[in-house]
Amino acid sequence: MLDLGLSKMALIGVVALVVLGPERLPRVARTAGALFGRAQRYINDVKAEVSREIELDALRTMKSDFEQAARNVENTIHDNLREHERDLNAAWNSAVSSGDPAAADASGGLGATSDEPSWRTVAAAPAKRRNWRVKKTATPVWYKRATMRRTQVQSGAARVARHQPSSLRRPARFF
């Protein structure tokens, strides 16, 4: 910025005193100080905004890197699962086709749906629940109260009137 020392500031003050006079100098000095302070605040705001944008950009790149790493891990896990499933299906099919009586009974007992039985079809349990009431009775009452919609909505004035003692109530006047 500007290199203003004490001697230069004193020289500027003397010139301003001579040019402006002692009556207007304090008002001009206050105005100049206010403008200088406003300029400093503006510069500090711009610096803060730039640093926030830089941090935000760094966070965005970090987020994208993290998401990419998560996708890579997910793809690796899915690939490994598919490979193991293929191995299990191959072992199951070889055991069924070789005439192993235990495997043949197991696949015939549950009724495999496809021509090529898989280890999943044998291990799969029936998905439908026999008693649909089990789900409703398993939900706690406090959860039902907290999540259900209110069916009896009461205004604030009605709520105050309901809980106000009868000794404090005003008598109702009808015309």
UniProtKB/Swiss-Prot annotation:
Composition skew (Low complexity), residue ranges: 99-115
Full protein name: Sec-independent protein translocase protein TatB
Region (Disordered): 99-118
Function: Part of the twin-arginine translocation (Tat) system that transports large folded proteins containing a characteristic twin-arginine motif in their signal peptide across membranes. Together with TatC, TatB is part of a receptor directly interacting with Tat signal peptides. TatB may form an oligomeric binding site that transiently accommodates folded Tat precursor proteins before their translocation.
Transmembrane regions: 1-21
Domain of life: Bacteria
GO annotations of cellular component type: TAT protein transport complex
One biological process term in Gene Ontology: protein transport by the Tat complex
UniProt KW keywords: Cell inner membrane, Cell membrane, Membrane, Protein transport, Translocation, Transmembrane, Transmembrane helix, Transport
Name of the encoding gene: tatB
Organism name: Burkholderia thailandensis (strain ATCC 700388 / DSM 13276 / CCUG 48851 / CIP 106301 / E264)
InterPro entries in alphabetical order: TatA/B/E, TatB
One Gene Ontology MF term: protein transmembrane transporter activity
Principal place of residence: membrane
Intracellular or extracellular location(s): Cell inner membrane
Membrane disposition: Single-pass membrane protein
Subunit structure: The Tat system comprises two distinct complexes: a TatABC complex, containing multiple copies of TatA, TatB and TatC subunits, and a separate TatA complex, containing only TatA subunits. Substrates initially bind to the TatABC complex, which probably triggers association of the separate TatA complex to form the active translocon.
Family (UniProt): Belongs to the TatB family.
